[in-house]
Amino acid sequence: MTVAPEGRKLLRLEVRNADTPIERKPPWIRVRARMGPEYTELKSLVRREGLHTVCEEAGCPNIFECWEDREATFLIGGDQCTRRCDFCQIDTGKPAELDRDEPRRVADSVRTMGLRYATVTGVARDDLPDGGAWLYAETVRAIKELNPSTGVELLIPDFNGRPDRLAEVFGSRPEVLAHNVETVPRIFKRIRPAFTYRRSLDVLTAAREAGLVTKSNLILGLGETPDEVRTALADLRGAGCDIITITQYLRPSARHHPVERWVKPEEFVEFARHAEELGFSGVLAGPLVRSSYRAGRLYRQAARARA
């Protein structure tokens, strides 16, 4: 393998990753498809209307439960990211020109799907003068204008920590402002070379100071130790993070970081208990948990804790 699917030459890191075959999943990494009436109706509607969600396109294992709750996730900014994280399946490259009509289309999709809660995430757009801040903020504004009763969670990149860009995004007032730290300090640069651990914590602190409910995610199985996970949880809580999800890394392809360890379900239970003891108001941890899983429920839980 010398060329990535998007046509670019593989990075040396990707070539090295590809030397390790794709790992066999343990027996507890299994999904049961429970297709309830809300899920069935939503799937039919999405097909009929030609709508696009991260839930389907990324093959999320939790789609059955989330759609049954009328929750879905949308990806904005295109399908090419200006940064590369070693766990992420989104392609790295030169993004297409900014699509200024995208916020309206996402808002229309939210209305057509009758969503109670929508998560919006996107690619990093370091090619744009504002890093994509307007696009993220405008998508929230468009959803809220067209769907005033729908909760919105916004999962953002770090916008290089620029206060003006963060202020633009925070001003759109999503119900939850999420920024995922993803891993622990020791291996952070190896996994997320275009981000910094400290800056990610600072983004969460700034969002909390702006009066927003804050959320982050940790991916396990990238080479961290249990003690490092506990330290990262304490760092996140200290930074003002309200909600935490803890997940198992599943390798998207051979060119991505190998799975270092399959974390057992009982370990996730222990990490969740530790997070609750630290004072997080919303906690979900498990092998198949993803950062937008049960997002609406976690928000309501955190909002009640604040009241």
Swiss-Prot record:
<dbReference type="Pfam" id="PF16881">
    <property type="entry name" value="LIAS_N"/>
</dbReference>
<feature type="binding site">
    <location>
        <position position="81"/>
    </location>
    <ligand>
        <name>[4Fe-4S] cluster 2</name>
    </ligand>
</feature>
<keyword id="KW-0004">4Fe-4S</keyword>
<feature type="binding site">
    <location>
        <position position="55"/>
    </location>
    <ligand>
        <name>[4Fe-4S] cluster 1</name>
    </ligand>
</feature>
<keyword id="KW-0411">Iron-sulfur</keyword>
<dbReference type="InterPro" id="IPR031691">
    <property type="entry name" value="LIAS_N"/>
</dbReference>
<feature type="binding site">
    <location>
        <position position="88"/>
    </location>
    <ligand>
        <name>[4Fe-4S] cluster 2</name>
    </ligand>
</feature>
<dbReference type="Pfam" id="PF04055">
    <property type="entry name" value="Radical_SAM"/>
</dbReference>
<comment type="similarity">
    <text>Belongs to the radical SAM superfamily. Lipoyl synthase family.</text>
</comment>
<keyword id="KW-0949">S-adenosyl-L-methionine</keyword>
<feature type="domain" description="Radical SAM core">
    <location>
        <begin position="67"/>
        <end position="281"/>
    </location>
</feature>
<keyword id="KW-0479">Metal-binding</keyword>
<keyword id="KW-0408">Iron</keyword>
<keyword id="KW-0808">Transferase</keyword>
<dbReference type="GO" id="GO:0046872">
    <property type="term" value="F:metal ion binding"/>
</dbReference>
<feature type="binding site">
    <location>
        <position position="292"/>
    </location>
    <ligand>
        <name>[4Fe-4S] cluster 1</name>
    </ligand>
</feature>
<dbReference type="InterPro" id="IPR003698">
    <property type="entry name" value="Lipoyl_synth"/>
</dbReference>
<dbReference type="InterPro" id="IPR013785">
    <property type="entry name" value="Aldolase_TIM"/>
</dbReference>
<protein>
    <recommendedName>
        <fullName>Lipoyl synthase</fullName>
        <ecNumber>2.8.1.8</ecNumber>
    </recommendedName>
</protein>
<feature type="binding site">
    <location>
        <position position="66"/>
    </location>
    <ligand>
        <name>[4Fe-4S] cluster 1</name>
    </ligand>
</feature>
<dbReference type="GO" id="GO:0016992">
    <property type="term" value="F:lipoate synthase activity"/>
</dbReference>
<dbReference type="InterPro" id="IPR006638">
    <property type="entry name" value="Elp3/MiaA/NifB-like_rSAM"/>
</dbReference>
<feature type="binding site">
    <location>
        <position position="85"/>
    </location>
    <ligand>
        <name>[4Fe-4S] cluster 2</name>
    </ligand>
</feature>
<comment type="pathway">
    <text>Protein modification; protein lipoylation via endogenous pathway; protein N(6)-(lipoyl)lysine from octanoyl-[acyl-carrier-protein]: step 2/2.</text>
</comment>
<dbReference type="GO" id="GO:0051539">
    <property type="term" value="F:4 iron, 4 sulfur cluster binding"/>
</dbReference>
<feature type="binding site">
    <location>
        <position position="60"/>
    </location>
    <ligand>
        <name>[4Fe-4S] cluster 1</name>
    </ligand>
</feature>
<keyword id="KW-0963">Cytoplasm</keyword>
<dbReference type="InterPro" id="IPR007197">
    <property type="entry name" value="rSAM"/>
</dbReference>
<dbReference type="GO" id="GO:0005737">
    <property type="term" value="C:cytoplasm"/>
</dbReference>
